């Protein structure tokens, strides 16, 4: 019995038709692990940064028709929410588990906060080859950093700084069949390794 990780069948919750039925599937197959991950990693971030972090598991409460295509737990230093702050995420689409750190378009002082990625441009380029960027958290697309030109990356960061709807996340993503999802131990190790790479961008 696993506590934190996800099986390939859990991702099939996103194939369930209809809002109510899909929410039931998410509640059964995915949200329990997200809550456990929320407890574990809010303590992890609090320990690593010296600031108190709070977990926020997606509720999808505003939806009335369209079922969610993704779900997540986010970590930020506010009890009230995470969208207005730089934050960490663990989440899922039907074809991927993703891990991210960055700034959403709704963030307060977004232009100032997003400049961390401008300052640490070289550090982004030096992330391992399987690290990616996400420029729209609502879409599954996450190009590999190694596949972007310097100009592509600079333009993406500038968009997050200067355009109202712009956002920028550094990310990592794995498939539902990935061996790092086979056990809690392997999954937690993967997540901690990823967040260790992200933390210097938070504290910069």
Swiss-Prot record:
Disulfide bonds: none
Domain of life from the UniProt record: Bacteria
Protein name (database record): UPF0637 protein SaurJH9_1166
Database matches in Pfam families: DUF1054 (PF06335)
InterPro entries: UPF0637, UPF0637_domain_sf
Similarity remark: Belongs to the UPF0637 family.
């Amino acid at each position: 019995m696993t506590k934190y990780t996800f099986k390939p069948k859990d991702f099939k919750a996103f194939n369930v038709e209809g809002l109510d039925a899909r929410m039931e599937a998410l509640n059964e197959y995915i949200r329990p692990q997200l809550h456990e991950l929320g407890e574990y990693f809010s303590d992890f971030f609090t320990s690593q940064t010296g600031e108190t972090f709070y977990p926020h598991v997606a509720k999808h409460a505003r939806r009335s028709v369209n079922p969610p295509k993704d779900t997540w737990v986010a970590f930020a230093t506010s009890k009230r929410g995470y969208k207005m702050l730089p934050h960490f995420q663990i989440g899922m689409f039907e074809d991927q588990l993703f891990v991210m750190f960055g700034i959403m378009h709704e963030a307060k002082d977004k232009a100032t906060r997003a400049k961390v990625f401008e300052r640490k441009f070289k550090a982004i380029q030096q992330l391992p080859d399987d690290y990616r960027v996400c420029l729209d958290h609502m879409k599954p697309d996450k190009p590999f950093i190694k596949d972007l030109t310097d100009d592509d990356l600079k333009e993406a960061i500038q968009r997050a700084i200067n355009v109202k709807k712009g956002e920028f996340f550094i990310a990592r993503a794995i498939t539902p069949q990935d061996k790092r999802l086979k056990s809690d131990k392997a999954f937690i190790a993967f997540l901690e390794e990823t967040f260790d790479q992200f933390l210097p961008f938070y504290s910069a």
